[in-house]
């Protein structure tokens, strides 16, 4: 089996690092393809060294362009590389333009796509990432869903449950892996104050003067904390444009930094009192490291963190930002609940599950793209109440059907093969020639 891994940004590299470790451990042949969406070549090489990863076999170097130009350049470069490499599967991770391009090119070449972090949905189509997620998943052959909620999103969109593997999220594996490296390599000096780590880069916040002003004025009032703010270049540009940067620079409790290296940032995050962010990945990292998270957005494709109690959506609401942070500070029971929120993303073995599932597909001859054999058959989709003691697997085998979704009362459930269906309703597909 040969795996081609397509990555383009720092978060993708971070989340795929434990998957690469697992592939290497099993001596599986693989090719690492870096599209170069975020970094110049030299910076990228240093990042791979810091995380103790092998250098990419291919570097496309698309750089920063419009979404259309970046996707087109990536697709053009990938097509030639995949013709040369001839992988059995192309793995992509997340929701970037590299994911979109990788999924489109591979599926057009009839190479199976494995999407790590499949099924995430914000249901906000103004976000380019949401478009990338949806389109990539329509091209995907193996869906590595991080949670059951993500798996259900895929089922509702018509994905076959046989191709959905609930793995947990590799961010847990990555945090555990990379924090060990950070403690060895990071040279950042951390103060003993109550640190609030702040990151902000999304267009809906930094391009909107009203929202940005509201967030900044909240920060200025939170002088009982030490707020450490590694400022993204685009964010700084807009802060200066809207005459807000000098206000932050004058505040003694706010420390403005240049963007930190990943290992330094991870160590900072792990020692924080709380985190304020509009990043999707940071919501996952915070709950993994038991750090209370306040998300500067009104929606999230990581709703599991909110439901678990480790994340609160505060948007750009000045009062809500201030009140929530003060509640965390003053109500120790509330703070403990956030710190001890159960991690919805698993036990740190997502990478192992991903490679196990991929090898199982390969061993069974299921890593193939071919037309369905029953394309001319009559599909009947039925809702049934199951009154007998029987599992999903046994029902499918006996009635030659495919259970799509299980309803336990009013709540949908993923149809795990060993699930007992007695007293539950199922939606199942039956093919009749």
PLM-predicted stretches and their roles:
Residues 4-7, 12-24, 47, 59-160:
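Active-site and donor-binding regions of nucleotide-sugar-utilizing enzymes
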Residues 28-70:
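Conserved nucleotide-sugar phosphate-binding/catalytic loop shared by glycosyltransferases and other
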Residues 37-40, 45, 65, 181-271, ...:
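Donor-nucleotide binding loops and adjacent catalytic segments primarily
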Residues 38-42, 139-211, 314:
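A nucleotide-sugar donor-handling region in carbohydrate enzymes
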Residues 92-93, 115-116, 143, 267-305:
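A donor-sugar binding/catalytic signature common to diverse glycosyltransferases
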Residues 140, 272, 401:
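An anion/phosphate-binding loop that grips the pyrophosphate of nucleotide cofactors and donors
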Residues 330-386:
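C-terminal amphipathic helix plus adjacent low-complexity
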């Amino acid at each position: 089996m040969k795996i081609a891994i397509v990555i383009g940004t720092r978060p993708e590299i971070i989340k795929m690092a434990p998957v690469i470790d697992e592939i290497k451990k099993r001596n599986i042949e693989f090719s690492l393809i870096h599209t170069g969406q975020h970094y110049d070549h030299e910076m990228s090489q240093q990042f791979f060294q810091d995380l103790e990863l092998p250098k990419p076999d291919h570097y496309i170097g698309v750089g920063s362009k419009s979404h259309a130009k970046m996707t087109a350049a990536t697709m053009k470069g990938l097509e030639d590389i995949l013709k040369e490499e001839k992988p059995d599967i192309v793995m992509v991770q997340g929701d970037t333009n590299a994911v979109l391009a990788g999924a489109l090119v591979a599926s057009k070449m009839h190479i199976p796509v494995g999407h790590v972090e499949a099924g995430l949905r914000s249901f906000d189509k103004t976000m380019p990432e949401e478009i990338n997620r949806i389109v990539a998943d329509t091209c995907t052959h193996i869906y590595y869903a991080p949670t059951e909620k993500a798996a259900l999103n895929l089922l509702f969109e018509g994905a076959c449950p046989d191709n959905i593997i609930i793995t947990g999220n590799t961010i847990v594996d990555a945090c555990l892996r990379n924090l060990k490296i950070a403690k060895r390599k990071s040279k950042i000096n951390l103060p003993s104050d109550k640190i609030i780590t702040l990151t902000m880069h999304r267009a809906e916040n930094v391009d909107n003067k009203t929202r940005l002003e509201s967030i900044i004025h909240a920060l200025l009032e939170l002088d009982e904390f030490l707020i450490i703010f590694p400022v993204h270049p685009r964010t700084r540009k807009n802060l200066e444009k809207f005459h807000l940067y000098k206000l932050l620079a004058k505040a003694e409790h706010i420390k403005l930094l240049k963007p930190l290296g990943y290992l330094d940032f991870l160590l900072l995050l792990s020692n924080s009192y709380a985190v304020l962010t509009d990043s999707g990945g940071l919501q996952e990292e915070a709950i993994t490291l038991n750090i209370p998270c306040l998300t500067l957005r009104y929606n999230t494709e990581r709703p599991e963190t909110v439901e678990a109690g480790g994340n609160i959506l505060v948007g750009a609401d000045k009062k809500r930002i201030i009140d929530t942070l003060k509640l965390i500070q003053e109500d120790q029971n509330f703070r403990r609940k956030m710190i001890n929120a159960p991690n919805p993303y698993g036990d740190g073995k997502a990478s192992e599950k991903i490679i196990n599932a991929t090898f199982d597909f390969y061993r069974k001859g299921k890593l193939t793209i071919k037309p369905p054999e029953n394309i001319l058959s009559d599909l009947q989709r039925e809702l049934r109440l199951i009154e007998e003691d029987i599992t999903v697997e046994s029902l499918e085998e006996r009635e030659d059907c495919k259970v799509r979704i299980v309803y336990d009362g009013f709540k949908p459930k993923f149809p795990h093969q060993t699930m007992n269906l007695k007293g539950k309703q199922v939606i199942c597909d039956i093919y009749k020639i």
